[in-house]
Amino acid sequence: MRAATVAQIKKELKHLPPEELQALVLRLARFKKDNKELLTYLLFEAGDEYSYIESVKSMVDEGFDSINTRSTYFAKKSIRKILSGLRKFIRYSGKKETEVELLIHFCERMNTMQPPITRSQVLMNLYDRLVAKVRATILKLDEDLRYDYSVELKSRLDEEL
């Protein structure tokens, strides 16, 4: 996600009512390092969650495409870097549906990685923890969404193991 310039953010803030502006700033206070990216999400991308999810998925795909797979050490390091960025974007959204969608996509990309993650116990443990986290998050959703995401999780991940 490319952060907007300070001028663009300032221009967008002029159009917000004071109550909304105050809520944005209070939420911003929780994040110290990535304030600019969070404001970009809140002002420009929060209204269209689907396109936000797709842009984050494309960044995950780019990260996986650039992984150095010659050494499992570098592969593990790259995967952890991608995952930490993904967690940051999930935190910006704060929606469980977004979290489930992005983590399923990340796990799916881990499954299709070459060389396979089954060669590294550390990567398998990371994968298992992520799948467990997805399942736990699915349980927190509404019943309809819970069923839909459970079916999607089963079809996209369990078949590939």
Identify the function of each model-found stretch.
Residues E101-L161:
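Glycine-rich, aromatic-bearing surface loops/beta-hairpins
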